[in-house]
Swiss-Prot record:
It comes from Streptococcus equi subsp. zooepidemicus (strain H70). It catalyses: L-lysyl-[protein] + 3 S-adenosyl-L-methionine = N(6),N(6),N(6)-trimethyl-L-lysyl-[protein] + 3 S-adenosyl-L-homocysteine + 3 H(+). Methylates ribosomal protein L11. This is Ribosomal protein L11 methyltransferase. It is found in: Cytoplasm. Pfam families: PrmA. GO terms for biological process: methylation. It is an enzyme of class 2 (transferase).
Length: 317
């Protein structure tokens, strides 16, 4: 019987995607993310509330490696990667790293237990790729395979981004997705009526994962995925730019975003913890955007900015 090695790491929620990607690059065959924020006040697929849990700033990420892999080398690689993240001022919190062996049949199903279909917005439901799910009238289904990296698409920062896209997209727009990760925001943009979507990520793993997830979904031939360093060097204008990435990186996006967003277009920024909200907001205001909407879930913030000279309906900076 082939066995697997299960490695579990507990980190601050802000570092979830960066650490998930690190585990994949170290050779993981899949990751599962357990975040209490995904369950606070949420109903499961049967309409029942999940048991009451105390929300924590920490998330638990479980990765799976073949039994033949040298777990000591893997731990060393991961620790080196974590050190690099610390140097980039990524909030990691109090780290915990453990590992154990897991039988083949346990590995095949263990991480799937974390993932149920989830109605995220009025129109959008995220469904795991292996689940048979019948959509109701008007319900738009996003199919994802979370067994790779970048979580399940139900993290508060992703939810806020999806709410924002649902708010600004009316059909026929060009959208740029910065730091696409799983590709969930690009898929959602297409389902919500965008004419064309351009998805970029600096990481080759993310580009592959996004392409694989997009292939799981219908009517997504209009999504173009490529490697790219934020918005640097791009000339393609867009009606909407969405960026769900670390706050410290968002501040470097605003100037290029203003250059690329069409007049009366939108910049959506998510992934912002409350303590860094003013920093991100000021960067966008300095670039020339006007703040239209501020959304909050727990400690996470999303901002919708507009490129306009019309001050009506705009929140004061």
């Amino acid at each position: 019987m082939k066995a697997w090695q299960e490695l579990t790491i507990t980190v601050h929620r802000e570092a979830e995607e960066a650490v998930s990607n690190l585990l994949i690059e170290a050779g993981s065959q899949g990751v599962a993310i357990n975040d209490t924020a995904d369950y606070i006040g949420q109903e499961n697929r049967f309409g029942e509330l999940y048991p009451a849990v105390e929300q924590s700033e920490m998330v638990t990420i479980t990765a799976y490696y073949p039994n033949s892999a040298d777990i000591d080398d893997i731990r060393q690689t991961i620790n080196q990667g974590l050190s690099r993240l610390k140097q980039c001022d990524v909030e990691l919190g109090e780290l915990t790293l453990t590992n154990q062996e897991l039988a083949e049949e346990d590995w095949a199903d263990n991480w799937k237990a974390y993932y149920e279909p989830a109605r995220i917005t009025h129109d959008l439901t995220i469904v795991p790729s292996w689940t048979d799910y019948e959509a109701t009238a008007g319900e738009k289904i996003i199919r994802l395979d979370p067994g790779m990296a970048f979580g399940t698409g139900t993290h508060p920062t992703t939810k806020l981004s999806l709410f924002a896209l649902e708010q600004v997209l009316r059909g026929g727009e060009t959208v740029i997705d910065v730091g696409t990760g799983s590709g969930v925001l690009s898929i959602a943009s297409s389902l919500l009526g965008a004419k064309e979507v351009f998805a970029y990520d600096l990481d080759d793993v993310a580009v592959r994962v996004a392409k694989d997830n997009i292939a799981l979904n219908q009517a997504t031939d209009n999504i173009h995925v490529a490697a790219g360093d934020l918005l640097k060097g791009l000339t393609q204008e867009a009606d909407v730019i969405v960026a769900n990435i670390l706050a410290d990186i968002l501040v470097h996006v605003t100037a290029d975003a203003y250059r690329l967003v069409k007049d009366e277009g939108y910049l959506i920024m998510s992934g912002i913890i409350s303590e860094k909200l003013d920093m991100v907001k000021q960067a966008a205001l300095n670039a020339g955007f006007l703040l239209e909407t501020h959304m909050l879930q727990g400690e996470w913030n999303a901002l919708i900015f507009k490129k306009t000279d019309d001050l009506s309906g705009v929140i004061g900076g």
